[in-house]
Regions:
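Duplex nucleic acid-engaging cores and interfaces of nucleic-acid transaction enzymes
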Residues: 1-171
Length: 172
């Protein structure tokens, strides 16, 4: 109760605890080592999932209306197709990470003793940090990396095909 201070807009014990959880969540999300581990786990064990916004709509993206593939096996042309389908509002695309493993990892890093008062608060802070702060950022990073690699691959194929076309003898 010593942290309750109406002058600082902390009017109850619950508000004080919620404020502490927010601070902990922010701190956890700023830990570079945690982000590196979570990103690696998401790339190795996560899945790219796409679903139709309207299953009755006909489009060239129908094969992606109920699609799922491991992040680390997604071909470049599929990344580009998923991006187009999302941009054209036929698909919703997300990365599903191994959330249970990630939360266990964070809890193991954050909780060093089993205290009946602090353990539940730290678990909630870990989950909030992951779901609200870390997961969206990691998903954006991974999707951006996948898109960049896919675009580089497409340019490379185009370059190779153009070179072959230009090196053909002229038709006389």
């Amino acid at each position: 109760e010593e942290y309750v201070n109406p002058k600082k807009e902390v009017n109850s014990v619950k508000e004080a605890i919620d404020g502490a959880k927010d601070i902990i969540a922010e701190s956890v999300s700023d830990e570079a080592d945690y982000r590196i581990w979570i990103r690696k786990a998401t790339v190795q064990h996560g899945k790219v999932i796409s679903q139709a916004k309207d299953e009755n709509a006909e489009s060239v993206y129908e094969m992606y209306y109920d699609f799922e593939e491991p992040v680390n096996r997604l071909a470049g042309h599929r990344v580009l197709a998923l991006n187009r389908g999302e941009k054209e509002k036929f698909l919703t695309v997300k990365i599903e990470a191994p959330q249970d493993d990630i939360l266990r990892y964070l809890e193991k890093k954050m909780i060093h003793s089993d205290n009946p008062y602090t353990t539940p608060i730290l678990k909630e802070a870990a989950e909030d940090s992951y779901k609200r702060l870390i997961a969206p950022a990691i998903e954006r990073e991974i999707r951006s990396d996948l898109t960049e690699k896919a675009e580089d691959g497409a340019i490379s194929v185009f370059k190779k095909n153009l070179h072959q076309l230009l090196m053909q003898p002229p038709n006389v």
